[in-house]
Amino acid sequence: AIAAVITFLILFTIFGNALVILAVLTSRSLRAPQNLFLVSLAAADILVATLIIPFSLANELLGYWYFRRTWCEVYLALDVLFCTSSIVHLCAISLDRYWAVSRALEYNCKRTPRRIKCIILTVWLIAAAISLPPLIYKGDQGPQPHGAPQCKLNQEAWYILSSSLGSFFVPCLIMILVYLRIYLIAKRSHRRGPRAKGGPGEGESRQACPVPGGPSASAKLPTLATPVASASEANGPSKPAGEKEEGETPEDPGTQALPPGWATLPNSGQGQKEGVSGASLEEEAEEEEEEEEEEDEPQAVPVSPASVGSPPLQQPQGSRVLATLRGQVLVGRGVGAMSGQWWRRRAQLSREKRFTFVLAVVIGVFVLCWFPFFFSYSLSAICPQQCRVPHGLF
């Protein structure tokens, strides 16, 4: 019965992890750099199921090590390597989740496939450093029954404690602290609500990863446009620059002239009036990637006394009319675009938190499964006589 259950678990492990690797490598929606962690973790689990569990099952059923001594040493090293790699992978994934939630804009620019591969390589090197001592130093392997060869790990206290700390307890402590920190961040951001720091009410604009040779992120376009002159100015002779009519109120210094090249909007009252239709520099840089944002580009339509007799200008949804000393300016949906960017950012954070919760459940179950082994394994080094664990329970 035990052999049948273990065999089913072996096949299920191989099949399930093979599907994970296949899904990440073939699905375009799963080709994010962070999913390389899942590919490496699944590979480690497949290696455990194919190279470790079958020989462990044979050793338990026979009661002795049937295979050669050389393979016993390699088997012990691979056992520590693959199991430690699986646990440290989960630790690396938890750190990746934490950086993605706490420093999303900055870390998303740095989360490249090259960086993720370097982290994965570091994980395997840590696991290899912990698994090498059984190959280099055989140490005390405990009493060997006559005529029944055994294959056991180094039974010296220093190796038991150091391997337990590096393989389980330290990564487990890191994961607990990291997920506690993620929980506190999620709780604080939920309390702050939509008007919290970074919300649309404070004019936050979404930052993009810096592009070499691109426009400066600090460049800003004017919010208000200088409205056109009255009908008498439009139909009468133009005056030299800087010359004002008698009794005319000086121009509000808060209003800025439109940059050259902005498109004009037609008006039914007179041929065409000057108007503006443009996008911020950041939106222009993102135009190719997010074409749907084009409808959120800010527009400013001047409204002057000359247009009183004309049909009323329809105000676009989400726009607003600002009054100046020389008339009114209809400002388009710049704030709406900003708000849309903020809500997209909120949706991204929500997805990160949901994924983090799922990973926390998986890691919690994984830790609960490993804790009994490492706890009893460590007791054999701390108090080998007084805290002896029954062989069947171990």
Curated annotation (Swiss-Prot):
TM helices/strands, residue ranges: 1-25, 37-62, 73-95, 118-140, 157-180, 359-382, 392-394
Q: Where is the composition biased (Low complexity)?
A: 299-312
**Stored Gene3D superfamilies:** Rhodopsin 7-helix transmembrane proteins
Any S-S bridges, and between which cysteines? Answer: C72-C151
Regions of compositional bias (Acidic residues) in chain numbering:
281-298
Q: Which residues lie on this side of the membrane: Cytoplasmic?
A: 26-36, 96-117, 181-358
Give the keywords, sorted: Cell membrane, Disulfide bond, G-protein coupled receptor, Membrane, Receptor, Transducer, Transmembrane, Transmembrane helix
List where in the cell it is found.
Cell membrane
Gene Ontology terms describing biological process? platelet activation; regulation of smooth muscle contraction; regulation of vasoconstriction
Coarse class of the primary localization is: membrane
Provide any one GO MF term from the record: epinephrine binding
Extracellular-side positions = 63-72, 141-156, 383-391
Kindly give the membrane topology term recorded for this protein: Multi-pass membrane protein
Region annotated Disordered, chain positions: 191-318
How this chain assembles, per its entry, is:
Interacts with RAB26. Interacts with PPP1R9B. Interacts with GGA1, GGA2 and GGA3.
| Functional note | Alpha-2 adrenergic receptors mediate the catecholamine-induced inhibition of adenylate cyclase through the action of G proteins.
Q: Which family does it belong to?
A: Belongs to the G-protein coupled receptor 1 family. Adrenergic receptor subfamily. ADRA2B sub-subfamily.
According to UniProt, the name of this protein is: Alpha-2B adrenergic receptor
Q: What species was this sequence derived from?
A: Oryctolagus cuniculus
Report which gene this protein is encoded by.
ADRA2B
